[in-house]
């Protein structure tokens, strides 16, 4: 699946985000205050008791490392001592996904930085929205393919959250370079927003010099979106996108045929809902709303805009 959305209202979401990003799925996530307030209070592990944790060299293994580290700071127990010896060295060939292995270093840096955020907290305290945001960005920093970062994120936050609004102000790229991994957007509920509230955010956008935060208008603050903000998604839901090259399309029949093929492929993909690693809510939502989008690339290179795009869209829906 191309994209997903998850509010960070459960400690297990951190591991799920790692799992999704490693599989190539872009993730929208919410650190709105009413979501992060649902996370448990911090209960640090016992530093005098350590337990070796051997990380399996797989998508699930890397995600588990994040999951169990997070769990150890919410529910106590032994302090984890990670063993990276099973992870393939940098440059090793990846047979299934293709490309070359990044080696253990990106994951090691991720876990050290995530634990750095968690270890600064006191027992009984809670993670703030910006701390949750930074943890997700550190997770995204570990997602590499052939040395190239491949994680796509959008972070939705409460419009009155001053720390998130200022998260890309000043020399943030020196102090918090991980924040480059995500677009940050303030959630604005259409029927509640006042003009003064909007322009308060807008002044911060101008002052940041970074073009952020973005402003995400919604009718329901519990719904989110994908990293490109193309589609509304309920919590723990996927969307599936396919794309057709229309640069050499010259007739309506050609356009309809490609749209039909793309719709068929996307519909077929939408049936693969045994996610095994994710909680059942993901499968339930995906089966309930099997969302599909068909996009076009190469539009300026051909006469496709002279054709009937509504007719092509109709063929997509009929095939789906």
Where are these regions (language model features)?
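Extended catalytic cores of very large enzyme megasubunits
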Residues: 1-320
């Amino acid at each position: 699946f191309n994209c997903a959305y998850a509010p960070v209202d459960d400690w297990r979401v951190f591991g799920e985000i790692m799992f999704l990003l490693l599989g190539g799925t872009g993730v929208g996530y919410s650190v709105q205050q009413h979501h992060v307030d649902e996370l448990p209070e911090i209960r640090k592990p016992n530093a005098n008791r350590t337990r070796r944790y051997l990380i399996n060299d797989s998508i699930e293994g890397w995600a588990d490392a994040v999951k169990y580290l997070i769990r150890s700071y919410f529910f106590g127990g032994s302090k984890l001592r990670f063993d990276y010896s099973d992870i393939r060295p940098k440059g090793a060939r990846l047979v299934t996904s293709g490309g070359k292995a990044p080696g253990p270093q990106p994951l090691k840096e991720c876990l050290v930085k995530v634990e750095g955020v968690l270890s600064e907290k006191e027992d009984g305290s809670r993670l703030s929205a910006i701390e949750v945001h930074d943890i997700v960005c550190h997770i995204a920093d570990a997602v590499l393919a052939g040395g190239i970062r491949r994680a796509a994120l959008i972070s939705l936050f409460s419009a009155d959250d001053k720390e998130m609004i200022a998260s890309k102000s000043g020399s943030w790229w020196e102090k918090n370079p991980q924040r480059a991994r995500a677009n940050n957007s303030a959630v604005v509920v259409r029927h509640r927003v006042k003009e003064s509230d909007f322009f308060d955010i807008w002044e911060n956008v101008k002052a940041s010099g970074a073009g952020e935060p973005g402003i995400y208008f919604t009718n329901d603050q519990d719904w989110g979106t994908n990293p490109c903000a193309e589609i509304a998604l309920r919590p723990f839901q996927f969307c599936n996108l396919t794309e057709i090259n229309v640069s050499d399309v010259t007739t309506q029949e050609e356009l309809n045929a490609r749209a039909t093929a793309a719709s068929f492929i996307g519909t077929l993909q939408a049936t693969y809902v045994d996610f095994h690693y994710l909680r059942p809510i993901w499968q339930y939502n995906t089966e309930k709303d099997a969302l599909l989008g068909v996009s076009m690339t190469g539009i300026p290179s051909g006469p496709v805009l002279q054709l009937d795009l509504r007719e092509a869209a109709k063929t997509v829906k009929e095939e789906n």
